[in-house]
Amino acid sequence: MKLLAFSDVHCDLGAVESLVEQARSADVVAGVGDFASIHEGLLQTVAPLAAIEAPVLLVPGNNETADALRSATAGWDRVTVLHGETAAIDGIDFFGIGGGIPTTPWDWSFDLTEDEAANMLVALPESAVLLSHSPPKGHVDKGLGSSAVLEAARDKHARAVLCGHIHEQWTNESRIGDTLVRNLGPDGYVLEL
């Protein structure tokens, strides 16, 4: 399975158009948050993604809420918003958790505490692909990642952790044991599963 994954487009329609083009050769597409910029421009930014013919999995970032993302994609046939939920595609589980984890200093930000995230991550299936807007603590995070994401990925032997949020770490990779951790960025990353 060929997965195209990205994060943090922040209303960049040129990046979105490039991702739609790249998606023509993908079996599944995953966007792990921050489609909007401080809750503005969400609908215009995600609208082009409706043209993608493969299944599309979207996770909210800290710049949009899960409810806003669900509303913006309501009625789309191939799009699933994941926030504390799992989608199975061709025998592979994908679990999504969005928002800033731990909480950020910005009053506009969609965030989760470490405890809220840990409670949500209890549902992470064994060996799933973990789509988390926030990176795991100590991995592609500049020291700002989530302990809950780290523990869940390690304990459930995640197949991969695909994240974003920390822009200075885009395209960087790390490992939690055998688990690939990749901070994606807006250019698109292809992973064979």
Question: In which residue ranges do the predicted regions lie?
Answer:
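Short glycine-/acidic-enriched loop or helix-start segments at secondary-structure transitions
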Residues: A15-V16, E40-L42, A68-R70, P105-W106, ...
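Beta-strand-turn-beta hairpins that frame and shape the catalytic cleft
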Residues: M1-L4, A87-G96, V129, S174-V181, ...
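Conserved beta-sheet core of the metallophosphoesterase superfamily
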Residues: A50, P55-L57, A74, G138-L193
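Core catalytic region of metal-dependent phosphoesterases/phosphodiesterases
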Residues: F6-I89, L184-D187
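Residue-level detector of structured alpha->beta connecting loops
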Residues: D27, E53, P125-E126, H157
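Conserved catalytic scaffold of divalent metal-dependent phosphoesterases
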Residues: C11, E64-A152
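Structural motif
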Residues: L3-A5, V29-V32, G96, V129-H133, ...
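Histidine-centered divalent metal-coordination motifs
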Residues: H10, N62-N63, H133, A160-H167
